């Protein structure tokens, strides 16, 4: 398997190495594995093609990793550092939106560019009017369960209000999260 990954990298570089938008590469997304191996792979990638920036993983939940860059990382993709959160999810669970804070405290001692991983992902109430649009394997069992639950509780008439209110909240949370990132001088970017 490991040799396949090295070979796959070689094929990617051969096919896309000169593409102008190929400027960064991660070994994978949310990897939980042997980080010595991942660092070795990044070292190999840098030796093979040094024209771009590399990172071991686009975030990880692996214990002992993910709060600071790995030794071979040219950039760091995470939800938090060892100093705190760099994405709203962990902050907005603890405090209300305030629109004047940033992520500077969590960025202290960061020696490579940092990108916040998968910001947002705020839940919005489903639009139950869309149920009939789904057919075949796309049957919206989750939407149907929500509809049945609302009907059982006598709240079905509120479904559109729930949709609108949750959508407005998601907009406010995205707005603050993106503004916090943009206000943080050391911040390098974010992924939606």
Give the residues covered by each predicted segment.
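Feature targets compositionally biased, intrinsically disordered low-complexity regions
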Residues: 63-65, 83, 135
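Active-site mouth of glycoside hydrolases
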Residues: 1-74, 109
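Extended, low-complexity intrinsically disordered regions
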Residues: 38, 85-86
């Amino acid at each position: 398997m490991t040799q396949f990954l090295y070979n796959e990298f070689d094929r990617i570089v051969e096919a896309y190495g000169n593409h102008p938008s190929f400027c960064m590469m991660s070994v994978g997304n949310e990897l939980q594995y042997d980080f010595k191996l991942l660092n070795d792979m990044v070292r190999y990638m840098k030796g093979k093609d040094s024209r771009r920036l590399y990172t071991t993983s686009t975030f990880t939940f692996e214990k002992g990793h993910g709060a600071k860059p790995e030794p071979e990382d040219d950039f760091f993709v995470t939800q938090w550092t060892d100093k705190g959160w760099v994405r709203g999810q962990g902050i907005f669970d603890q405090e209300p939106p305030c629109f004047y804070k940033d992520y500077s405290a969590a960025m202290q001692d960061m020696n490579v560019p940092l990108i916040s991983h998968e910001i947002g992902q705020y839940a919005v109430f489903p639009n139950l009017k869309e149920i009939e649009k789904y057919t075949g394997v796309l049957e919206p069992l989750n939407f149907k369960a929500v509809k049945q639950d609302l009907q059982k509780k006598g709240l079905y008439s509120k479904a559109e209000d729930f949709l609108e209110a949750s959508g407005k909240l998601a907009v406010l949370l995205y707005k603050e999260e993106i503004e916090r990132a943009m206000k943080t001088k050391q911040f390098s970017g974010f992924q939606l």
